[in-house]
């Protein structure tokens, strides 16, 4: 076992991006940046890294078949060492959160527990696993707002709701695209239980609610925001709409819906950030 294996199992690129997202979340919540956002970045980076490690710990048997190059099945990190490493990172992340705010500490603790629960149980639970991933993504915005206080946290609720619903839609469609592979490996997903068509319909409903929620920030950002987000909403609605009527994963993949949704979500982040800074 070497340092490289312990570094790789944290999926550093993924963890750093999550940490940077916390900085963006604070910027959206307040329109400004302070040195304290580096603490937010550190907490999210460490907790995300811990979540990645604990996920590999529980997926060790599956990765032996599907991803033998991952640190645990390749022998770079033992399973017991990975467990100890995961909880060390969790504890370090929670320790850093002590220097933020009580609200941030609470969110960090909830997310740490949810990451363990997701890896151990929820990942293989239809819909609830998807919802957990969506919540973890959306909670970064709550985390950024929480650092600025209750008022900023409440202002971020619509942004978090939009992110949760759009991410949930994408996660459901991704499962529908992977239905054959998941079925072959004995996985249990919502798409396997109800089929591609109904899954796409639920995903479309999620995006419709996300679009409805995207109108709320107009109350404090005004008309320029509404014009920008309306353009993005059209992309997201188009992306989800293309999936309607698909009855199999091949036709669903051909629509490019998940890719378009990802682009739409990134564009919405740009609109939120520009609105927070300039409006």
Swiss-Prot record:
<comment type="similarity">
    <text>Belongs to the UbiA prenyltransferase family. DGGGP synthase subfamily.</text>
</comment>
<keyword id="KW-0443">Lipid metabolism</keyword>
<comment type="pathway">
    <text>Membrane lipid metabolism; glycerophospholipid metabolism.</text>
</comment>
<feature type="transmembrane region" description="Helical">
    <location>
        <begin position="127"/>
        <end position="147"/>
    </location>
</feature>
<keyword id="KW-0812">Transmembrane</keyword>
<feature type="transmembrane region" description="Helical">
    <location>
        <begin position="90"/>
        <end position="110"/>
    </location>
</feature>
<feature type="transmembrane region" description="Helical">
    <location>
        <begin position="219"/>
        <end position="239"/>
    </location>
</feature>
<keyword id="KW-1133">Transmembrane helix</keyword>
<feature type="transmembrane region" description="Helical">
    <location>
        <begin position="148"/>
        <end position="168"/>
    </location>
</feature>
<keyword id="KW-0472">Membrane</keyword>
<dbReference type="GO" id="GO:0005886">
    <property type="term" value="C:plasma membrane"/>
</dbReference>
<comment type="function">
    <text>Prenyltransferase that catalyzes the transfer of the geranylgeranyl moiety of geranylgeranyl diphosphate (GGPP) to the C2 hydroxyl of (S)-3-O-geranylgeranylglyceryl phosphate (GGGP). This reaction is the second ether-bond-formation step in the biosynthesis of archaeal membrane lipids.</text>
</comment>
<dbReference type="InterPro" id="IPR000537">
    <property type="entry name" value="UbiA_prenyltransferase"/>
</dbReference>
<protein>
    <recommendedName>
        <fullName>Digeranylgeranylglyceryl phosphate synthase</fullName>
        <ecNumber>2.5.1.42</ecNumber>
    </recommendedName>
</protein>
<keyword id="KW-0808">Transferase</keyword>
<dbReference type="GO" id="GO:0000287">
    <property type="term" value="F:magnesium ion binding"/>
</dbReference>
<dbReference type="InterPro" id="IPR050475">
    <property type="entry name" value="Prenyltransferase_related"/>
</dbReference>
<feature type="transmembrane region" description="Helical">
    <location>
        <begin position="5"/>
        <end position="25"/>
    </location>
</feature>
<keyword id="KW-1208">Phospholipid metabolism</keyword>
<dbReference type="InterPro" id="IPR044878">
    <property type="entry name" value="UbiA_sf"/>
</dbReference>
<keyword id="KW-0444">Lipid biosynthesis</keyword>
<keyword id="KW-1003">Cell membrane</keyword>
<keyword id="KW-0460">Magnesium</keyword>
<dbReference type="InterPro" id="IPR023547">
    <property type="entry name" value="DGGGP_synth"/>
</dbReference>
<feature type="transmembrane region" description="Helical">
    <location>
        <begin position="198"/>
        <end position="218"/>
    </location>
</feature>
<dbReference type="GO" id="GO:0047295">
    <property type="term" value="F:geranylgeranylglycerol-phosphate geranylgeranyltransferase activity"/>
</dbReference>
<feature type="transmembrane region" description="Helical">
    <location>
        <begin position="259"/>
        <end position="279"/>
    </location>
</feature>
<feature type="transmembrane region" description="Helical">
    <location>
        <begin position="27"/>
        <end position="47"/>
    </location>
</feature>
<dbReference type="GO" id="GO:0046474">
    <property type="term" value="P:glycerophospholipid biosynthetic process"/>
</dbReference>
<keyword id="KW-0594">Phospholipid biosynthesis</keyword>
<dbReference type="Pfam" id="PF01040">
    <property type="entry name" value="UbiA"/>
</dbReference>
């Amino acid at each position: 076992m070497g340092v490289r294996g312990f570094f790789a199992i944290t999926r550093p690129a993924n963890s750093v991006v999550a940490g940077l997202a916390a900085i963006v979340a604070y910027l959206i919540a307040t329109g400004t940046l302070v040195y304290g956002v580096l603490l937010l970045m550190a907490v999210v980076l460490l907790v995300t890294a811990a979540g990645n490690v604990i996920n590999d710990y529980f997926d060790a048997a599956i990765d032996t078949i599907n991803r033998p190059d991952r640190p645990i099945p390749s022998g770079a990190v033992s399973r017991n060492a990975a467990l100890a490493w995961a909880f060390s990172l969790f504890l370090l992340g929670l320790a850093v959160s002590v220097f933020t705010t009580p609200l941030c500490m609470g969110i960090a603790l909830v997310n740490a527990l949810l990451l363990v629960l997701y890896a151990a149980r929820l990942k293989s639970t239809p819909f609830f696993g998807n919802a957990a991933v969506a919540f973890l993504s959306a909670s970064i915005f709550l985390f950024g707002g929480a650092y600025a206080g209750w008022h900023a946290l409440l202002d971020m609720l619509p942004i978090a709701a939009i992110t949760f619903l759009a991410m949930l839609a994408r996660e459901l469609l991704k499962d529908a695209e992977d239905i054959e592979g998941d079925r072959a490996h004995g996985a249990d997903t919502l798409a396997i239980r109800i089929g591609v068509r109904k899954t796409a319909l639920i995903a479309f409903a999620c995006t419709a609610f996300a679009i409805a929620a995207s109108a709320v920030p107009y109350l404090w950002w005004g008309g320029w925001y509404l014009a920008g987000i309306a353009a993005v909403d059209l992309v997201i609605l188009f992306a989800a709409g293309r999936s309607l009527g698909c009855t199999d994963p091949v036709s669903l993949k051909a629509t490019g819906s998940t890719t378009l949704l990802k682009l739409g979500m990134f564009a919405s982040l740009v609109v939120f950030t520009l609105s927070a800074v300039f409006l």
